[in-house]
Swiss-Prot record:
Topology class, membrane: Multi-pass membrane protein
InterPro entries: ZIP (IPR003689)
MF terms in GO: zinc ion transmembrane transporter activity
Extracellular side: 1-3, 64-85, 194-199, 254-265, 316-317
Function: Transporter for the divalent cation Zn(2+). Mediates the influx of Zn(2+) into cells from extracellular space. Controls Zn(2+) accumulation into dentate gyrus granule cells in the hippocampus. Mediates Zn(2+) reuptake from the secreted milk within the alveolar lumen.
Recorded catalytic activity of this chain's protein: Zn(2+)(in) = Zn(2+)(out)
Residue stretches spanning the membrane: 4-24, 43-63, 86-106, 173-193, 200-220, 233-253, 266-286, 295-315
Modified residues (Phosphoserine): 125, 129
Designated gene of the protein: Slc39a3
Keyword terms: Cell membrane, Ion transport, Membrane, Phosphoprotein, Transmembrane, Transmembrane helix, Transport, Zinc, Zinc transport
Family affiliation: Belongs to the ZIP transporter (TC 2.A.5) family.
Descriptive protein name: Zinc transporter ZIP3
GO biological process: one example: zinc ion transport
Length: 317
């Protein structure tokens, strides 16, 4: 138990600093070097696809079995037996809840792109691609150099409108930070509620990769909006702290060791599993495999990410 607690605390610290660095680095060091930007875009895109494979294994090889085990424990306490796929249904409820919250946020914002969109990493694709926005960073004021080419008029689809994010003021950026924060709490909950070391490690790898890339997207949007470094640091700390907050909540629920805490753990893990489904299929795979460049290489990284985490499930930590 002590080793498990130490592992979760290390996960809290690790994810926090990964996200903080990912958020602030673009604000501090982005340069108008098109060749370097193109290379960075390709590397981030491949890392993102690798993260998609990691999340597939995390969801189906680690998190889903954990939800099944926890539900079985809860049902056995009440002497209830059923063949109904409760774990799968609970995860789908979490998935639909995440989609609903996303669309609710977008309805109030009167926008259509997904609220946690890694389209940032698909920037600079060829003309005629299905990505709507291929220019996630366009300089403001003294930062007048374009990091990526401007999007073509023929592009369509859903994407995070980073080009427009800074125009009306800070409200859109704040709404993005709020959405990212709410999303991150559930991912942190999934980590904090785990009872086995190998599941903690596999979840940590998936969350760390995905959330770091999301933090980079946030950093690019803050750089696009010419946010001062001090204000950017405040926003970055806020978002970066949400995973540790979720882990802390999960630890508190798990340490209660009561029937109510077991029920809460099963429900929250199932709902968090739905969030992972949303991230995997509607954020990562839908965006990355939509691109017409490096498709086979992305599939290779997708399989590689899955294989790495699927193998880690069999390890005992």
């Amino acid at each position: 138990m002590t080793k498990l607690l130490v592992a979760k605390v290390l996960c809290m610290v690790g994810v926090f600093f990964f996200m903080l660095l990912g958020s602030l680095l673009p604000v501090k060091v982005i340069e108008a070097d098109l060749e370097k930007a193109h290379r960075s875009k390709k590397v981030l895109s491949l890392c993102n696809t690798f993260g998609g494979g990691v999340f597939l294994a995390t969801c189906f090889n680690a998190l889903l079995p954990a939800v099944r085990d926890k539900l079985q424990q809860v049902l056995s306490l009440g002497h209830i037996s059923t063949d109904y796929p409760l774990a799968e249904t609970l995860m789908m409820v979490g998935f639909f809840l995440t989609v609903f919250v996303e669309q609710l946020v977008l309805t109030f914002r009167r926008e259509r792109p997904p609220f946690i969109d890694l389209e940032t990493f698909n920037a600079g694709s060829d003309a005629g691609s299905d990505s709507e926005y291929e220019s996630p960073f366009v300089g403001v004021g003294n930062r007048s150099h374009s990091l990526y080419p401007e999007p073509t008029a023929h592009t369509h689809g859903a994407g995070l409108r980073l080009r427009e994010l800074g125009r009306p003021g800070p409200l859109r950026l704040l709404s993005l930070v709020f959405a990212l924060s709410a999303h991150s709490v559930f991912e942190g909950l999934a980590l904090g509620l785990q009872e086995e070391g190998e599941r903690v490690v596999s979840l940590f790898v998936g969350v760390a990769i995905h959330e770091t890339l999301v933090a980079v997207a946030l950093g690019i949007s803050m750089a696009r909006s010419a946010v001062p470094l001090r204000d950017a640091a405040k926003l970055a700390v806020t978002v970066s702290a949400m995973i540790p907050v979720g882990i802390g909540l999960g630890l508190g629920i798990e340490s209660a060791r009561s029937v109510a805490s077991s029920v809460a753990s099963a429900l929250l893990q199932g709902l968090a599993g739905g969030t992972f489904l949303f991230v995997t299929f509607l954020e990562i795979l839908a965006k990355e495999l939509e691109e017409r460049s490096e498709q086979l290489l992305k599939v290779l990284f997708l399989v590689l990410g899955y294989a790495v985490l699927a193998g880690m499930v069999f390890l005992k930590w």
